[in-house]
């Protein structure tokens, strides 16, 4: 399966809700959901059938994959690892997704969206514990310190992210220093700490068949 490179607003329209994939644009009347709140495609307006059973489980999985920009193989690996670990499988799945470096860069306000955060990680603008890490899926651990590299602090995308995040409350499991573009993981995220429009239990049911 190739990575999706088309317009991300179509993904929100397909799921019928805002997935906040384009940062600040999602909070304006320019958002595609505000203009065309129906599925993309020739017959998008006519899709009125109620989704149940497998279809509902599939939609929840697709939402999670699209929010975190993961492919099917990688997403299934997260599930397999969560299912083998002690604890609630769905919560452990979300925990792994939240601890991705690109997601944490987004949560810390280094970018206005996960997509932007993924780019700044890939381009080597983020370091973990003083070392450059350019792997978006890198799993950050409790105690790790994440920051924007000194030479990258003036990037327009980073400054936009800082301005956007300065008015937002920081996640309870992260310690954020907006002035120095840095942060620290102080604990693993609990499900109640993660504002995510996904029913992870339906994903577990889908994969456990």
From Swiss-Prot:
SMART domains: Ribosomal_S4, S4. GO terms for cellular component: small ribosomal subunit. One of its GO terms (molecular function) is rRNA binding. One of its GO terms (biological process) is translation. Disulfide bonds: none annotated. Residues 99-161 form the S4 RNA-binding domain. Keywords: Ribonucleoprotein, Ribosomal protein, RNA-binding, rRNA-binding. It comes from the Bacteria. Part of the 30S ribosomal subunit. Contacts protein S5. The interaction surface between S4 and S5 is involved in control of translational fidelity. HAMAP family: Ribosomal_uS4_B (MF_01306_B). Belongs to the universal ribosomal protein uS4 family. One of the primary rRNA binding proteins, it binds directly to 16S rRNA where it nucleates assembly of the body of the 30S subunit. With S5 and S12 plays an important role in translational accuracy. This is Small ribosomal subunit protein uS4. The lineage of its organism: Bacteria, Pseudomonadati, Acidobacteriota, Terriglobia, Terriglobales.
């Amino acid at each position: 399966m190739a990575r999706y490179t088309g317009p991300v607003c179509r993904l929100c329209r397909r799921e019928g809700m805002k997935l906040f994939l384009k940062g600040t644009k999602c909070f304006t009347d320019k958002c595609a959901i505000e203009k065309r709140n129906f599925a993309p495609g020739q017959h998008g307006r006519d899709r009125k059938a109620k989704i149940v059973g497998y279809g509902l489980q599939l939609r929840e999985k697709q939402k999670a994959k699209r929010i975190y920009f993961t492919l099917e193989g990688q997403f299934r690996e997260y599930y397999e690892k969560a299912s083998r670990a002690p604890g609630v499988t769905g919560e452990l799945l979300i925990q792994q997704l939240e601890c991705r470096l690109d997601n944490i860069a987004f949560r810390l306000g280094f970018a206005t969206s996960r997509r932007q955060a993924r780019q700044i990680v890939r381009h080597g603008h983020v370091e973990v514990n003083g070392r450059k890490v350019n792997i978006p899926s890198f799993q950050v651990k409790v105690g790790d310190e994440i920051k924007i590299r000194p030479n990258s602090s003036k990037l327009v995308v980073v400054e936009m992210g800082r301005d956007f995040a300065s008015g937002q409350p920081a996640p309870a499991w992260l310690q954020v220093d907006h002035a120095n573009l840095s942060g620290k993981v102080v604990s693993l995220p609990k499900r109640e700490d993660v504002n995510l429009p996904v029913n992870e239990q339906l994903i577990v049911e889908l994969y456990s068949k």
